[in-house]
Amino acid sequence: CIYGSVQYNSTPDNNLLVDGFLAKQFFDEIPTAPGTRVYVTEQVTDVTSNVLSGVTPSTSGIDRYKMIEANRKSLIADCESSGNHRCGVSSFHQGLEYFLIKRLEVRDVRLVYAPATSIGKYGGDIDNWQWPRHTGDFGFYRAYVGTDGQPAEYSEDNVPYAPASFLEVSAKGVEEGDFVMGVGYPGGTNRYRTTAEVENEFEWYYPQARDFREDIISIINENSIDGSAARIAYESTLASLSNYSKNFQSMVESYGKSDFIDRRTEAEANLVEWINSDSDRRARYAPAVGQLEALIDSNHAARESDLVRSYMGYATLPSAAHRLYRLAMEKQKPDAEREPGYQERDLRRLRQSMQAISRRFDETVDKATLSYLLSRYAELPEQYRSQATDSFFGISSNIDQGQVDQVIEDSYALTSLSDEATRLAWLDSSVEEFEASDDPLIRYAVLSYAERMALELESKELRGQFQRWRPEYMEAVIAYNRSLGQ
């Protein structure tokens, strides 16, 4: 997160990415990138019964998804009533439990220190995700609050935030054999995925996603000069792409050297045998095993198109157009019925993301990225392509990349979305204004909206089905492990 703010504050004449940054006094600290926040977890509450209220075993996939989402949004709205908290509902044990996490949202965050590239990115990513790592990859923010101790917008009168508790950093240094601990905020885990999912992840998804990332890295580098404004605009993106490309590659290599899939296959077979060895267990858990297996097979059928669509967001301006039009559509609904990301609680973030584009976008790079992504999209079977996308860009099974590139060129020449004031104005525009626009990228967003929503509806139906069966499968895993004394 530090790197994004360093990039945002860098220019060719004042390249903090290369030179580093140090605020020797409080007043030397500089604002971070728009939307930067510090979150302090204050409370974690089990809300499983609240989230699953009204849900029954016979509830359809889409209805289950909608009911759980509505219950989540209601809990979050109550939790955020003070105006100073950002709350979320997270599922644990694959949806077997749900917890409401209440976090203080500190909005005035300033950059204090960032190392020079020669320290912070020493050696590149060659030893990233490995131990030991010979890189000074760290930085410092300072969080500020109002004089009353409550979160506030940026002001010179604000004071440093004082947490209720903290760890002291020793100035004594370390010695051979000292205890070392890695500290991090809990994220997610895939350790309870099925053998079929694990195999797909390591043998298909990670290699494919790595290649996508490496290709986009090459496109950015080929279309921007090192140290130029264009390259600086994408340094944070490059770091993110490279970070997970290395992660995926390392996991694939480790997987190939291990007997992991054999052990996972054996463990899953033992679980199924344990379930089937008892009539009560078979009645309780066997349906979940079978249904989950069928859902996974169904989900894998569209994996290529899902992957391509997941990377389309790297084309900045078309992505912005889609988000802006989606906002206009969502604003027609009561706030509680809007899609997460488009509620009133999200509008400040959405505005800040539109502002940030001004320092994280270059037209040449964006056009080249979109050209690449559409070339990958065109490789999909016709049934997985969008009629609106095919029509707008002139894509068919026999793609003429030159023709597609000309459509891209013409669209970027005529769009005004590269202008920040225009993007911000669209935030307050009506559906009718979008539909009447002659901006080509806005027109594309309008034309493709119905198909995008149809795909989203299919995805929600599938997610609702997973929400039905994953918790029962997880319940079986827990019961089996307990039978082994684990």
Name each model feature, range by range.
Residues 1-486:
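Terminal presequence/propeptide segments associated with secretion/organelle targeting
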